[in-house]
Amino acid sequence: MPTQRLFTGGDHRFLQALRRELGAAVETRLAVAFVLQSGVDLLAPTLRAALLRPGQHVRILTTDYLGVTEPEALEALLALPAVNGAKLELRAYEARGHSFHPKAYLFRHASGARRAFVGSSNLSATALQHGVEWNWSSLEPADGEVLLDAEMTDLL
């Protein structure tokens, strides 16, 4: 995959890129406003395989903002088995009337390289497969300037 790329839906499917990164990463951080069962179903096999790898760490931050996130989707994520020191953390931002609407997918590889996708896709089948969504991908090499830390690390 190129160092930078825009995924716009149509022939540029975001789901395949997410599966590829999740399948290779040692650490995954997602911040998505809405988590739907349809999106969890699409990523569950890849997440399940990732959580079988020793030391894998998956963090997902979502919200109760607007009541869109589906409780059954969160339950399905928490039900995924993790072994060999792997773990899945799930956090929910309590909106309390404030907007919480990020869509960021961050991956760190064993080499130290990091890939970030930032855009408009929530964790839903429509957003990941065929919706009109824009998601920008950027690869930061292991020896590159660390751009993905600071606020993202604090948030996720």
Model-derived regions: residue spans:
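PLD/PLD-like phosphodiesterase catalytic module centered on the HKD motif
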Residues: 1-156
